[in-house]
Amino acid sequence: RTPLTLICAPLKRIINQESDKQDVEKLLVPIYKQAYQMKSIIDMVLDVRKLEEGKDMLHILPHPLNEWVRSVGDKFINEFHVKGIRLEYELDEQIKEVPFDQNKCEFVLSNFLMNALKFSESGTTTTLITTLSQEKDWVRISVRDEGMGLNMVDTDSLFSSFYQGGHEKGGSGIGLSYAKSLITHHKGRVGASNAAGKGAIFYFELPLFTDTCGQLE
């Protein structure tokens, strides 16, 4: 309801009063942003439904994981720099190629990075980490920040639809739920916990071996 309110209220002001071009532009820019956010939320809900109904397929192919993780993280360097947050990498060199859908997993990793950016302060560090399991059959991709941590949230509900936690910086409550759905369809796992000392860790795990590469229901 919040995005709709932020769209309808300024539109009503535009309709009810004569405004010059500059005033109209100031009102229309946030309207566009909220409309775009609503479109993104609707797209995520529809994509989850398609996955659940088997109408959307994952395009799973082997990719060099560490190289991919760094390429996704590098897209956020400017945003972290503007906020005064360091972005670092701890990549397990044992990990080579891993089968996954690049586009779907990029959404998941980007969502975790946006959360770190949102809840971290200037002067802190966010770290992208890859880890190979002891059995060498799973890899874990983690985002560790030095933000406010997870004391204000129910970690059991964190990846549930529309859950927003007990903090003031709420979102749509869809992103993490969508991320979980994408990783579950990879036959993987997602999770989150408080980091040692300060901050939070969000992670997802992918199996190193799948029945087939290419398309996986």
What do these predicted regions represent?
Residues 33-38:
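Short alpha-helical segment of the dimerization/phosphotransfer core of two-component systems
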Residues 49-60:
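Helix-loop junction within the histidine kinase core
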Residues 59-64, 81, 86-96:
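Conserved catalytic submotifs in the C-terminal HATPase_c
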Residues 116-117:
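Short helix-loop "hinge" at the ATP-lid/N-box region of the Bergerat-fold HATPase_c
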Residues 175, 179:
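Short alpha-helical Gxxx[C/S/T] motif in the catalytic ATP-binding
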